[in-house]
């Protein structure tokens, strides 16, 4: 099972491997709250700044981010982690429901055909 949640939310038994997918380490988060930090899977600085969590740009953000992911070799590492574990949780810090972890989950589910 693949899920997403805020890194600040409480740990749960079904989280499985907890993978932080943000470029920057979130404030106040201790290292033992995250199993793996894949900062290179996050959107480019250019794309992140362009999007700026503007809901009107969400669909275009996803399209551009999916293009970046299709060229990112770290996706293979992430897919291997997900396939190795029964459960995986993509962690993000944003308060916005439209964020890179949600988009990444959508992309991975297409790749995995879930």
Which residues fall in each region the model found?
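Residues lining hydrophobic/aromatic ligand-binding pockets adjacent to catalytic sites
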Residues: 1-114
């Amino acid at each position: 099972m693949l899920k997403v949640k805020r890194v600040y939310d409480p740990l749960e038994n079904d989280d499985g491997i907890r993978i932080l997918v943000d470029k920057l380490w979130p404030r106040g988060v201790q290292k033992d709250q995250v199993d793996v930090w894949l900062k290179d899977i996050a959107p480019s600085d250019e794309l992140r700044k362009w999007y700026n969590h503007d809901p009107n740009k969400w669909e275009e953000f996803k399209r551009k981010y999916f293009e970046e992911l299709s060229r990112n070799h770290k996706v293979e590492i992430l897919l291997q982690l997900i396939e190795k574990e029964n459960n995986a949780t993509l962690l993000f810090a944003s308060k916005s429901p439209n964020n890179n972890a949600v988009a990444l989950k959508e992309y991975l589910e297409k790749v995995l055909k879930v």
